């Protein structure tokens, strides 16, 4: 799958500011076992995302909401 990895504690995607190929996003995506990552829409987007890893939006927690 493809998508935004999510911080399960906050429900937020990982923010980024340098659009396109981005070392921070590549590292975040590799951390969860994805094949590749880049900054898209000010969030890290991962390709070849493992099916068993959560992605944004995270149903159990809405980013910035209680």
Curated annotation (Swiss-Prot):
GO terms assigned for molecular function: sodium channel inhibitor activity; toxin activity
Family matches, as InterPro entries: LCN-type_CS_alpha_beta_dom, Scorpion_toxin-like, Scorpion_toxin-like_sf, Scorpion_toxinL, Scorpion_toxinL/defensin
Domain LCN-type CS-alpha/beta: 1-64
Record propeptide residues: 64-66
Gene3D superfamilies per the UniProt record, alphabetical: Knottin, scorpion toxin-like
Tissue expression: Expressed by the venom gland.
A GO BP annotation: defense response
Localization of this protein: Secreted
Cystine residue pairs: 12-63, 16-39, 25-44, 29-46
Entry GO CC: extracellular region
The entry's keywords: Amidation, Disulfide bond, Ion channel impairing toxin, Neurotoxin, Secreted, Toxin, Voltage-gated sodium channel impairing toxin
Residue numbers bearing the Cysteine amide modification: 63
Pfam family, one: Toxin_3
Main location: secreted
Domain notes: Has the structural arrangement of an alpha-helix connected to antiparallel beta-sheets by disulfide bonds (CS-alpha/beta).
General function of this protein: Beta toxins bind voltage-independently at site-4 of sodium channels (Nav) and shift the voltage of activation toward more negative potentials thereby affecting sodium channel activation and promoting spontaneous and repetitive firing.
Entry similarity comment: Belongs to the long (4 C-C) scorpion toxin superfamily. Sodium channel inhibitor family. Beta subfamily.
Protein name per Swiss-Prot or TrEMBL: Neurotoxin Cex11
The species this protein was found in: Centruroides exilicauda (Bark scorpion)
Lineage summary: Eukaryota, Metazoa, Ecdysozoa, Arthropoda, Chelicerata
């Amino acid at each position: 799958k493809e998508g935004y990895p999510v911080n399960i504690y906050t429900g937020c995607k990982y923010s980024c500011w340098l659009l396109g190929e981005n070392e921070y996003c590549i590292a975040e995506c590799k951390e969860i076992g994805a094949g590749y990552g880049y900054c898209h829409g000010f969030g890290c987007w991962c390709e070849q995302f493992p099916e068993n890893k959560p992605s944004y939006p995270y149903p159990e927690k809405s980013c910035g909401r209680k």
